[in-house]
């Protein structure tokens, strides 16, 4: 997968309009309320809901004569929206947080609580397990498994920094940490809880803190770390 342009990512964060996205539930006489087109307004006779930027909604509410209203705030001065996942050809479970400018390959699986930062790339058929974190610009190849609670460190700044790169067919156990600038070779296995600070050769098994090569991947290793295509069907 091609790495996303670093300068474009930085420009997006720096120059995007900062907003405070809210959802507001209204009760009262609502017929006289008028919101700008940028606000999604679903108004009935006595109750309604509006969704938009608090900076646009707040002045209108201050002038309105309402019986009550309640505000749900999704963020404050946010610069990067969440990715629109409706068109993704992947399985994305509720509770995953995926920012814009993330690339997701076909039949990838992103489990509950996973956090995927801007510029990250996930290859086809790769599973990102529960609570895993992919930092900015982290690259994961095809048909990998990134274990629950694992962290792939991100690098958005400095822009010249090398991102974490995970090759195809890599298995990473739960709660491992892969530091920025590290490359993990194709078919490698990283044990649960390992902290990877150096590049991992292809088809090796690493474990420990810091992670060290303990053996080559063999038939026994492959049997224990086999990935199931059945879990990646849509």
Swiss-Prot record:
It catalyses: (S)-2,3,4,5-tetrahydrodipicolinate + acetyl-CoA + H2O = L-2-acetamido-6-oxoheptanedioate + CoA. GO terms for molecular function: tetrahydrodipicolinate N-acetyltransferase activity. Pathway: Amino-acid biosynthesis; L-lysine biosynthesis via DAP pathway; LL-2,6-diaminopimelate from (S)-tetrahydrodipicolinate (acetylase route): step 1/3. Pfam families: DapH_N (PF08503), Hexapep (PF00132), Hexapep_2 (PF14602). GO terms for biological process: diaminopimelate biosynthetic process; lysine biosynthetic process via diaminopimelate. PANTHER family: 2,3,4,5-TETRAHYDROPYRIDINE-2,6-DICARBOXYLATE N-ACETYLTRANSFERASE, ACETYLTRANSFERASE. Belongs to the transferase hexapeptide repeat family. DapH subfamily. This is 2,3,4,5-tetrahydropyridine-2,6-dicarboxylate N-acetyltransferase.
């Amino acid at each position: 997968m091609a790495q996303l342009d670093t300068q474009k990512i930085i420009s997006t964060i720096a120059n995007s309009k900062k907003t405070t996205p809210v959802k507001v539930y209204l009760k009262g006489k609502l017929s006289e309320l008028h919101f700008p087109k940028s606000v999604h307004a679903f108004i009935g006779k006595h109750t309604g809901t509006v969704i938009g930027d608090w900076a646009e909604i707040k002045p209108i509410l201050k002038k309105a004569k309402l019986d009550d209203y309640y505000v749900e705030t999704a963020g404050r001065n946010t610069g990067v929206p969440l990715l629109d996942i409706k068109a993704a050809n992947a399985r994305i479970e509720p509770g995953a947080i995926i920012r814009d400018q993330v690339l997701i390959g076909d039949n990838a699986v992103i489990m509950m609580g996973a956090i995927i930062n801007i510029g990250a790339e996930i290859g086809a058929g790769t599973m990102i397990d529960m609570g895993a974190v992919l930092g900015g610009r982290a690259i994961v190849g095809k048909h990998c498994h990134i274990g629950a609670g694992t962290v792939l460190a991100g690098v958005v700044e400095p822009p010249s920094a090398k991102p974490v790169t995970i090759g195809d067919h890599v298995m990473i156990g739960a709660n491992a940490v892969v530091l920025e600038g590290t490359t993990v070779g194709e078919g490698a296995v990283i044990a649960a809880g390992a902290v990877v600070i150096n590049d991992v050769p292809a088809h090796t098994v690493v474990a420990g803190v810091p992670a060290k090569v303990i053996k080559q991947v063999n038939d026994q290793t492959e049997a224990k770390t086999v990935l199931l295509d059945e879990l990646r069907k849509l």
